């Protein structure tokens, strides 16, 4: 596990979405660009050049910086400088048991797939296996908003080992079969490349850069499809009103968009990236640097786009403002049951009965 809370990439995404465009970012590996393939060190925002590690202003647009200047952040973050974000034990325990139930059942179903069924899905598209949310760990607190954190937990021996084994095996099955799951994040460098979407979009090679104005969003697997709509300005057909975790629940994935080990169960947001290990890493934010005035605009834009409830559920009390203030103060973040009361019920977060599937997205959904 890498990063659970928003990191440099995700801050770039947030600002891209808030300002409906792509901002220039700087990485030591790639220099200035509008792509987000490398860890960003600086970005241009609101007429200022901002350090992505402390959100302090380090220069202006007129002075195009060629490297991250020395400032009070002095950002050459070392691994030993990372801050551990610890999750409450019972939160982790409930989550891991839910995950184990999910991956074990999906693995068993994939094992039962016949070669004929696999060939049919490869040729015609569609769903290969489906797992209904209601089949996942009926005793988990994540099943119902009325469940209690103190409810009895099933004892599972070698829980971490089993989780790792099942998840790894499931990934291998999916990759070896060239299938697309709708429940986990994939490396955006190959997520849609060459995938048959049907219609005019068949075999379209999509850009590897993030574009908030596009109907296709990187870093997550699309898990719902609607009608194709043709945009002459784009020169291709695309899916209108795509439902993606990035747009619906915020992008709280892993750093560098690496594959998450957190599936999206039904329409439940995968915001607990660190739950499978009980902790995650985040960059330390150094006090004393000039704060980014744009943060307030950004918070307002994100709250408007996603809704306060979703933000609070994802980041805990205080939402994004609270997260920003806590990290700027370098305070250890402990997620407790009280911080996770915003369970995504059917009213706020859609139908939890939504199935999770593996198959070809040509007619998936």
Curated annotation (Swiss-Prot):
Domain of life: Viruses
GO cellular component, one term: viral outer capsid
Compartments, as annotated in UniProt: Virion; Host cytoplasm; Host nucleus
Entries under Gene3D superfamilies matching the protein: Outer-capsid protein sigma 3, large lobe, Outer-capsid protein sigma 3, small lobe
Keywords carried by this UniProt record: Capsid protein, Host cytoplasm, Host nucleus, Host-virus interaction, Inhibition of host innate immune response by virus, Inhibition of host interferon signaling pathway by virus, Inhibition of host PKR by virus, Interferon antiviral system evasion, Metal-binding, Outer capsid protein, RNA-binding, Transcription, Transcription regulation, Translation regulation, Viral immunoevasion, Virion, Zinc, Zinc-finger
Record note on quaternary structure: Heterohexamer of three sigma-3 and three Mu-1 proteins. The RNA-binding form is probably a homodimer.
Protein name (database record): Outer capsid protein sigma-3
């Amino acid at each position: 596990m890498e990063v659970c809370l928003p990191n440099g990439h995700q801050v770039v995404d947030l600002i891209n979405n808030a300002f409906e465009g792509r901002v220039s970012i700087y990485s030591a590996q790639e220099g200035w660009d509008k792509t987000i393939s490398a860890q960003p060190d600086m970005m241009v925002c609101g007429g200022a050049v901002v350090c992505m590690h402390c959100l302090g202003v380090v220069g202006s647009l007129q002075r195009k910086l060629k490297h991250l200047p020395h400032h009070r952040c002095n950002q050459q973050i070392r691994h030993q400088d990372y801050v551990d974000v610890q999750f409450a034990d019972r939160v982790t325990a409930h989550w891991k048991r839910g995950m184990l139930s999910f991956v074990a059942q999906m693995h068993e179903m994939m094992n039962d797939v016949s070669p004929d069924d696999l060939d049919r899905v490869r040729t015609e598209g569609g769903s290969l296996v489906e797992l209904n949310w209601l089949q996942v760990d009926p005793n988990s607190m994540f099943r119902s908003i009325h469940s209690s954190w103190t409810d009895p937990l099933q004892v599972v021996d070698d829980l971490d080992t089993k989780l790792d084994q099942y998840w790894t095996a499931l990934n291998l099955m999916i990759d070896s079969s060239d299938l697309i799951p709708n429940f986990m994040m994939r490396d955006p460098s190959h997520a849609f490349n060459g995938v048959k979407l049907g219609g005019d979009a068949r075999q379209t090679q999509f850009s590897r850069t993030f574009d908030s104005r596009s109907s296709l969003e990187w870093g997550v697997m699309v898990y719902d499809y609607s009608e194709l709509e043709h945009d002459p300005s784009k020169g291709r057909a695309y899916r209108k009103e795509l439902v993606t975790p990035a747009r619906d629940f915020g992008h709280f994935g892993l750093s560098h968009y690496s594959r998450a080990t957190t599936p999206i169960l039904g329409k439940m947001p995968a915001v607990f990236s660190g739950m499978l290990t009980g902790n995650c890493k985040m960059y330390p934010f150094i006090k004393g640097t000039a704060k980014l005035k744009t943060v307030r605009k950004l918070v307002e834009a994100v709250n408007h786009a996603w809704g306060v409830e979703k933000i609070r559920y994802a980041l805990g009390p205080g939402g994004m403002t609270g997260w920003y203030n806590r990290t700027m103060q370098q305070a250890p973040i402990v997620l407790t049951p009280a911080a996770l009361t915003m369970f995504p019920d059917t009213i706020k977060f859609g139908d939890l009965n939504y199935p999770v599937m593996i198959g070809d997205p040509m007619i998936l959904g």
